[in-house]
């Protein structure tokens, strides 16, 4: 013990000597740490039993609350705090565990570092990639803002990969072209090797520490607090201690990510459960285009782990059992860098026609071993590691077995390009006061029927920032927060109590697996009416089985059984809208490929001159957005439709891209 005391005294003496040697500015103590995670301990918080004596509620008041702390949520939250708004951020995960961390490939922006480029060419590629279901005003906004967004990230300290002369390195990615599709392959994708999402999320998280945002970490958002058709905050469950919190705010931003876990095989984290999408549904508001689910061409066979499109951007090729580079037959110009929906369908056809690989002939190969080992080591280090761990493959010597895997949800909460959530009434869009959405949870719609690779990370940053700017334009810090009823959130607490004591016959895990396998079997890469109809029936039945659930943990402290059951409820609402929307859409467009309706059905036949053609009525064509609603008590799905926005923000500066036959 005496030795320990002597060592302690010695270290203290050295620290004192070092402190005296520091400049005076550094002797004022540690840097202020603004990442406030004890949101429930704020002096302004008030406890009441206005809902139930069994579930006391802690009430909070903020100028704005952001739900979700991935790339979009963080950018919205610190953007609001930077503008002076008293901001809360509610997240069921610590921010750096959000699924943004898993993105690999990069961020598209027309910087022109590898060759001449123009954001208008990027605009054209994105409209074409969307199969003309994207709203061109939002696409205009996003592509024009992209270069500035990348520069902003660089200024925040994001360590982009570099060219030899020090510029941000840009790789080729699918569906990207020069000169409006006539100038060959574009190199537009800015990256940090193959760990771009990881770098982006940590960069934004680091930036967020500069601002006084109150983070409610490991709080599960249950529902929106709606009064008089406007949003006034959220109600959330503190997972750590089981307390209920009502966070009242003048503005609410939903940034909860996608719902990939409705499917059995997907690249999404197990926490991608469509929580925000489901909250919108329970609030009686519509979701948009949920039938458009992207299957990434290269998930590791058997594991579903993502292998970035950046592999093909660096020169990787897809081959079948005959060693043929088969994409040359399906996309003669773009080949392996065609858009994701085209590549996934081509792979599926190769397997169907008997040219699959392996003993079961049920996958294809991604070949990288023809590339220089130093290129693999510097540009694709994470992929080399992932392939070894999950496929047992040394990418310098053998190909990776891959299969299309659910990766992204193009649909979500309908918004305009400012991030304001929309409802559609009597043929007109109406803004829902106080409610915003961004990231994969939202549908602006910049991706339409198919998202181009490397267009999502930039979507997070641009529209997270747009939400903050929009709130800053319409409100001031300290504006009066509208009141809520004393029992606001009562239904959410009743539902939580019901699930906590659920004593049926079906485990949450069993019902979730049945839903995931049904979605995988009935709404996959290729779809057909009879199978979709069967799937609608199965998912509806499974939704009804929610009332037969059995939970086992009756406590309130770290009750993960309860949280997973709440997530299952959310997934079911997303699954219902996805499969009913797919069954109703009698055409093939982007990621929605119907074998019984193989043509894209527009208002005109764009394979021919439109002069002399009669425009189809709105109800007779499918170039329109699906709006879906669910009666939560019965599971009945109702569908409506709203027109696609073709006008840009400034036709003189960026002309509308008219629909055309889409080929690569």
From Swiss-Prot:
<keyword id="KW-0560">Oxidoreductase</keyword>
<feature type="binding site">
    <location>
        <position position="91"/>
    </location>
    <ligand>
        <name>FAD</name>
    </ligand>
</feature>
<feature type="modified residue" description="N6-acetyllysine">
    <location>
        <position position="608"/>
    </location>
</feature>
<dbReference type="Pfam" id="PF02910">
    <property type="entry name" value="Succ_DH_flav_C"/>
</dbReference>
<feature type="binding site">
    <location>
        <position position="407"/>
    </location>
    <ligand>
        <name>oxaloacetate</name>
    </ligand>
</feature>
<feature type="binding site">
    <location>
        <position position="92"/>
    </location>
    <ligand>
        <name>FAD</name>
    </ligand>
</feature>
<feature type="modified residue" description="N6-acetyllysine">
    <location>
        <position position="517"/>
    </location>
</feature>
<feature type="modified residue" description="Phosphotyrosine; by SRC">
    <location>
        <position position="215"/>
    </location>
</feature>
<dbReference type="InterPro" id="IPR027477">
    <property type="entry name" value="Succ_DH/fumarate_Rdtase_cat_sf"/>
</dbReference>
<keyword id="KW-0007">Acetylation</keyword>
<comment type="subunit">
    <text>Component of complex II composed of four subunits: the flavoprotein (FP) SDHA, iron-sulfur protein (IP) SDHB, and a cytochrome b560 composed of SDHC and SDHD. Interacts with SDHAF2/SDH5; interaction is required for FAD attachment. Interacts with TRAP1. Interacts with LACC1.</text>
</comment>
<feature type="modified residue" description="N6-succinyllysine">
    <location>
        <position position="615"/>
    </location>
</feature>
<dbReference type="GO" id="GO:0006099">
    <property type="term" value="P:tricarboxylic acid cycle"/>
</dbReference>
<feature type="modified residue" description="N6-succinyllysine; alternate">
    <location>
        <position position="485"/>
    </location>
</feature>
<feature type="modified residue" description="N6-acetyllysine">
    <location>
        <position position="598"/>
    </location>
</feature>
<feature type="modified residue" description="N6-succinyllysine; alternate">
    <location>
        <position position="335"/>
    </location>
</feature>
<comment type="pathway">
    <text>Carbohydrate metabolism; tricarboxylic acid cycle; fumarate from succinate (eukaryal route): step 1/1.</text>
</comment>
<keyword id="KW-0999">Mitochondrion inner membrane</keyword>
<dbReference type="GO" id="GO:0045273">
    <property type="term" value="C:respiratory chain complex II (succinate dehydrogenase)"/>
</dbReference>
<dbReference type="GO" id="GO:0022904">
    <property type="term" value="P:respiratory electron transport chain"/>
</dbReference>
<feature type="binding site">
    <location>
        <position position="457"/>
    </location>
    <ligand>
        <name>FAD</name>
    </ligand>
</feature>
<feature type="modified residue" description="N6-acetyllysine; alternate">
    <location>
        <position position="498"/>
    </location>
</feature>
<feature type="binding site">
    <location>
        <position position="105"/>
    </location>
    <ligand>
        <name>FAD</name>
    </ligand>
</feature>
<keyword id="KW-0249">Electron transport</keyword>
<dbReference type="InterPro" id="IPR015939">
    <property type="entry name" value="Fum_Rdtase/Succ_DH_flav-like_C"/>
</dbReference>
<keyword id="KW-0809">Transit peptide</keyword>
<dbReference type="GO" id="GO:0009055">
    <property type="term" value="F:electron transfer activity"/>
</dbReference>
<dbReference type="InterPro" id="IPR011281">
    <property type="entry name" value="Succ_DH_flav_su_fwd"/>
</dbReference>
<protein>
    <recommendedName>
        <fullName>Succinate dehydrogenase [ubiquinone] flavoprotein subunit, mitochondrial</fullName>
        <ecNumber>1.3.5.1</ecNumber>
        <ecNumber>1.1.5.-</ecNumber>
    </recommendedName>
</protein>
<comment type="similarity">
    <text>Belongs to the FAD-dependent oxidoreductase 2 family. FRD/SDH subfamily.</text>
</comment>
<feature type="modified residue" description="N6-succinyllysine; alternate">
    <location>
        <position position="179"/>
    </location>
</feature>
<dbReference type="GO" id="GO:0005743">
    <property type="term" value="C:mitochondrial inner membrane"/>
</dbReference>
<feature type="binding site">
    <location>
        <position position="69"/>
    </location>
    <ligand>
        <name>FAD</name>
    </ligand>
</feature>
<feature type="modified residue" description="N6-acetyllysine">
    <location>
        <position position="550"/>
    </location>
</feature>
<dbReference type="Pfam" id="PF00890">
    <property type="entry name" value="FAD_binding_2"/>
</dbReference>
<feature type="binding site">
    <location>
        <position position="100"/>
    </location>
    <ligand>
        <name>FAD</name>
    </ligand>
</feature>
<keyword id="KW-0274">FAD</keyword>
<feature type="modified residue" description="N6-acetyllysine; alternate">
    <location>
        <position position="179"/>
    </location>
</feature>
<feature type="modified residue" description="N6-succinyllysine; alternate">
    <location>
        <position position="547"/>
    </location>
</feature>
<dbReference type="GO" id="GO:0008177">
    <property type="term" value="F:succinate dehydrogenase (quinone) activity"/>
</dbReference>
<feature type="modified residue" description="N6-acetyllysine; alternate">
    <location>
        <position position="335"/>
    </location>
</feature>
<feature type="modified residue" description="N6-acetyllysine">
    <location>
        <position position="167"/>
    </location>
</feature>
């Amino acid at each position: 013990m005496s030795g320990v005391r002597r060592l302690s005294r010695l270290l203290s003496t050295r620290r004192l000597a070092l402190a005296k040697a520091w400049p005076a500015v550094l002797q004022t103590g540690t840097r202020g740490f603004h990442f406030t995670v004890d949101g429930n301990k704020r002096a302004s918080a008030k406890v009441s039993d206005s809902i139930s004596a069994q579930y006391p509620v802690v009430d909070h008041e903020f100028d704005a609350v952001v739900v979700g702390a991935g790339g979009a949520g963080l950018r919205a939250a610190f953007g609001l705090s930077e503008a002076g708004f008293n901001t809360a951020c509610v997240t069921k995960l610590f921010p750096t565990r959000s699924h943004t961390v898993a993105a690999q490939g990069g961020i598209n922006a027309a910087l022109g570092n590898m060759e001449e480029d123009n954001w208008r060419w990027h605009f054209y590629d994105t409209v074409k990639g969307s199969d003309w279901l994207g709203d061109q005003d939002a696409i205009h906004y996003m592509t024009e803002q992209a270069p500035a967004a990348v520069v902003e990230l660089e200024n925040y300290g994001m360590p982009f990969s570099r060219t030899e002369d020090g510029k941000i390195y840009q790789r080729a990615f699918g569906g990207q072209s020069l000169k409006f599709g006539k100038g060959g392959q574009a190199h537009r994708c800015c990256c940090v090797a193959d760990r771009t999402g990881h770098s982006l999320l940590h960069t934004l998280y680091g930036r967020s520490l500069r601002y006084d945002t109150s983070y409610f970490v490991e709080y599960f958002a249950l529902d929106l607090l709606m009064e008089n058709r406007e949003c006034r905050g959220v109600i959330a469950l503190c997972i750590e201690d089981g307390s209920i919190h009502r966070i009242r705010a003048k503005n609410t931003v939903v940034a909860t990510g996608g719902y990939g876990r409705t499917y059995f095989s997907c690249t999404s984290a197990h926490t991608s459960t469509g929580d925000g999408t489901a909250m919108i549904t329970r609030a009686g508001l519509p979701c948009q285009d949920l039938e458009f689910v992207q299957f990434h061409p290269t998930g590791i066979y058997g594991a579903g782990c993502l292998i970035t499109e950046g592999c093909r951007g660096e020169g990787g090729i897809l081959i079948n059992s005959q060693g043929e580079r088969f994409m040359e037959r399906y996309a003669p110009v773009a080949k392996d860098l065609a858009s994701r929906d085209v590549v996934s369908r081509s792979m599926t056809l190769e397997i169907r026609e008997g040219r699959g690989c392996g003993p079961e002939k049920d996958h294809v190969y991604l070949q990288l071993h023809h590339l220089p080992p130093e290129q693999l080591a510097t540009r694709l280090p994470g992929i080399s590691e992932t392939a070894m761990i999950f496929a047992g493959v040394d990418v310098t010597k053998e190909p990776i077995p891959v299969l299309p895997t659910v990766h992204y949800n193009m649909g979500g909460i309908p918004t305009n390009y400012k991030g304001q959530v929309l409802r559609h009434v009597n043929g007109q869009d109406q803004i829902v006061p106080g409610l915003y959405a961004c990231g994969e949870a939202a549908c602006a719609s910049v991706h339409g029927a198919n998202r181009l690779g490397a267009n999502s990370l930039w979507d997070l940053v641009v529209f997270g920032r747009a939400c903050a700017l929009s709130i800053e334009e319409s409100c001031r810090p300290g504006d009066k927060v509208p009141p809520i009823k004393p029992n606001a959130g009562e239904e959410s607490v009743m539902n939580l109590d019901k699930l906590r004591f659920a004593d049926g016959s079906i485990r949450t895990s069993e019902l979730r697996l049945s839903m995931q396998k049904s979605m995988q079997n009935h709404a996959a890469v290729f779809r057909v009416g009879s199978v979709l109809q069967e799937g609608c029936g199965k998912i509806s039945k499974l939704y009804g089985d929610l009332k037969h659930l059995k939970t086992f943990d009756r406590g309130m402290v770290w009750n993960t059984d309860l949280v997973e059951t709440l997530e299952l409820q959310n997934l079911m609402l997303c699954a219902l809208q996805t499969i009913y929307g797919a069954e109703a859409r009698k055409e093939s467009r982007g990621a929605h490929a119907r074998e019984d309706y193989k043509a894209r059905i527009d208002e005109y036949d764009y394979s021919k001159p439109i002069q002399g053609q009669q425009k189809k009525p709105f109800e007779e064509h499918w170039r329109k957005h699906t709006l879906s609603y669910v009666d939560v008590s019965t599971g009945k799905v109702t569908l409506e439709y709203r027109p696609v926005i073709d006008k840009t923000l400034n036709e003189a500066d960026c002309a509308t891209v008219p629909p055309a036959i889409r080929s690569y």
